[in-house]
Regions:
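Conserved, well-structured ligand/cofactor-binding cores
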Residues: 1-441
Length: 441
C-alpha cells in the first residue's frame, strides 16, 4: 500500500493547521460507508463503470475497517461545510482504488460522483452519531441504570438521614436514594432515544444546495437504502433542504447528552458528600480506592473516579454549548458548523460512555454503606420532630425542635417508652402515613 495523500489534502493540511484535532474513527467509518453506498448505487444506475465502482467499494470498505485511517489527516477546524474532510476521503479512496484497479480513479469524477460535501458530510455525521450512541452510550447507560436499580433493592432497608438544603430532613433509605438516581437515568435514556429518532433522516442526494442537480433522481433514496443495509439502522431519506441547512436535529442528541451529564454530576456530588470524612465528614458510605489520593498525605483516599466522571460530564456540557453555537452558523442553503458539530458530538458520546462505565464498575458496584453511622445520624436528625407536628401544631413543634430531641418531646406528651420505641422505628418513617394517628392503637 502506498501514499494516499492527494493535492487537495496537502493544501488543506497547510491552510487548516489550527489544532491537533482529527476526526474520530466513527466519523471516518461513516464517511467510508457513504462512499461505498454511493459507488454501488452509481454503478446500479449505470453511471459508473462496474470495475471502477468495485474498486471504489473495496477501498471504501478498507476505510470502514480502519485500514486507511492514517491518511485521514485534515484538521477538524476547517471550512464549515466539511469539504476538507470530504476531499481527504475522496483522495484516499481514489488513490487506493487506482492501486486496486490498475488505472486512475478520479476523486471528484468517480468517488464523489453525484455528491457534494454539503450533503455527504451532514449525512455522515448523522450516521456516525446514531451508530456511536446505539453501540456505546445506550448500552453503557442501560448497564449503569440497572446497577443503580440493583443497589436500590440491596439497600432497601438501610435508613439514613434525609437532607434538604444540606440540613437535617426526614429519614429516607439508601435504597430510595439509589432508586431515584436510577429513575433519573431512565428518564434520560428515554430522552436520548427520542432524540435519536430525529437524526434518522439523511440529506444525501441534495448535492450543493438541496436541489439534487448533477445526481440521479433516485440516487439519494437508493444510497439511504444501502446505508440501512450496511448499518442495520432505520435511516430514511430526508428533505435535503432541511438536513443541509439545519443541524438542530443533531443538537437534540447533544441536548439529551447534556441532560445525562447534569444528572451524572448530581449523582456524583451526592456520592462525594456521603463519602466525605472519614472522621470530619458524613462518612455514610465507603468506596474502595485503587490508587493513593494524595502525593503528600499518606493513607489519604479520595473519590478519584467520582471526580473524573464529573470532569467528563463538565466537558460534555461545554461541548454541548459549542454544538449549540456551531449548528447556528451558516446562512441560506447550508450550515457552516458541520465538521465541528460532528467532532464535538462524537466526543460527547465517548466521554459519557466512558464515565458511566468507569463509575459503574469502580464506584456503584463497590459502594459499602456504613450502616451504623447512617442509623445514628438518622436518629439524631432534628427533623424527626415533624412527626408530632400534626398532634401539637407546627409552631409548637418548631419550638420543641430547638429545645429537645424527639424522644424527650414524645415523653413530654405523656407517651410511654414502649410506644416511643414503636414510633421511632425509623424504617416506618420512610413510608407514607401519619404516625401520630397510630398512637395508642
Amino acid at each position: 500500500m502506498g501514499e494516499y495523500i492527494g493535492d487537495y489534502t496537502r493544501k488543506a493540511m497547510e491552510l487548516f493547521n489550527f489544532s491537533s484535532f482529527r476526526f474520530q474513527r466513527s466519523i471516518v467509518k461513516a464517511m467510508g460507508m457513504v462512499k461505498y453506498a454511493a459507488a454501488k448505487v452509481n454503478s446500479q444506475l449505470s453511471l459508473l463503470p462496474s470495475d471502477v465502482a468495485e474498486a471504489i467499494m473495496k477501498a471504501s470498505w478498507e476505510l470502514v475497517e480502519g485500514k486507511l485511517d492514517e491518511w485521514v489527516v485534515v484538521d477538524v477546524i476547517q471550512t464549515g461545510s466539511g469539504t476538507g474532510l470530504n476531499m481527504n476521503i475522496n483522495e484516499v479512496i481514489a488513490k487506493r482504488a487506482s492501486e486496486l484497479l490498475g488505472r486512475v480513479v478520479h476523486p471528484n469524477d468517480h468517488v464523489n460522483m453525484g455528491q457534494s460535501s454539503n450533503d455527504v458530510v451532514p449525512t455522515a455525521i448523522r450516521v456516525a452519531t446514531y451508530l456511536e450512541v446505539e453501540s456505546s452510550l445506550i448500552p453503557a447507560l442501560t448497564d449503569f441504570t440497572r446497577l443503580l436499580e440493583d443497589k436500590a433493592v440491596e439497600y432497601g432497608d438501610l435508613v439514613k438521614p434525609g437532607r434538604t438544603h444540606l440540613r437535617d430532613a426526614l429519614p429516607v433509605t439508601l435504597g430510595q436514594e439509589f432508586k431515584a438516581y436510577a429513575g433519573m437515568f431512565l428518564r434520560d435514556t428515554e430522552f436520548l432515544k427520542s432524540a435519536l429518532e430525529r437524526i434518522r433522516e439523511l440529506p444525501i442526494g441534495g448535492t450543493a444546495v438541496g436541489t439534487g442537480l448533477n445526481t440521479h433522481p433516485r440516487f439519494g433514496e437508493l444510497v439511504v437504502e444501502e446505508l440501512r443495509r450496511l448499518t442495520g439502522l432505520p435511516f430514511r431519506r430526508g428533505n435535503s433542504f432541511v438536513g443541509m441547512r439545519s443541524l438542530t436535529d443533531v443538537y437534540m442528541v447533544s441536548s439529551a447528552m447534556k441532560a445525562i451529564a447534569l444528572d451524572l454530576i448530581r449523582l456524583c456530588n451526592d456520592l462525594r458528600l456521603m463519602y466525605s470524612g472519614p472522621n470530619t465528614g458524613l462518612n455514610e458510605i465507603d468506596i474502595p480506592q485503587e490508587i493513593p489520593g494524595s502525593s503528600i498525605m499518606p493513607g489519604k483516599e479520595n473519590p478519584v473516579i467520582v471526580e473524573a466522571s464529573m470532569l467528563a460530564a463538565v466537558q460534555v456540557i461545554g461541548l454541548d454549548t459549542a454544538v449549540s453555537l456551531a449548528v447556528n452558523l451558516g446562512e441560506f442553503e447550508l450550515s457552516m458548523g458541520i465538521p465541528l458539530t460532528g467532532y464535538d458530538i462524537i466526543l460527547e458520546v465517548q466521554l459519557l460512555s466512558g464515565a458511566l462505565r468507569q463509575l459503574g464498575e469502580y464506584v456503584i458496584a463497590r459502594v459499602k454503606p456504613n450502616k451504623e453511622r447512617m442509623r445514628k445520624l438518622a436518629e439524631s436528625s432534628t427533623a424527626l420532630i415533624t412527626m408530632i407536628s400534626p398532634l401539637v401544631g407546627y409552631d409548637k413543634a418548631s419550638m420543641l425542635s430547638k429545645a429537645v430531641n424527639i424522644r424527650d418531646a414524645l415523653r413530654g406528651l405523656g407517651i410511654s417508652e414502649n410506644e416511643i420505641n414503636r414510633i421511632l422505628n425509623l424504617k416506618r418513617l420512610t413510608e407514607p402515613g401519619i404516625i401520630t394517628r397510630e398512637l395508642g392503637k
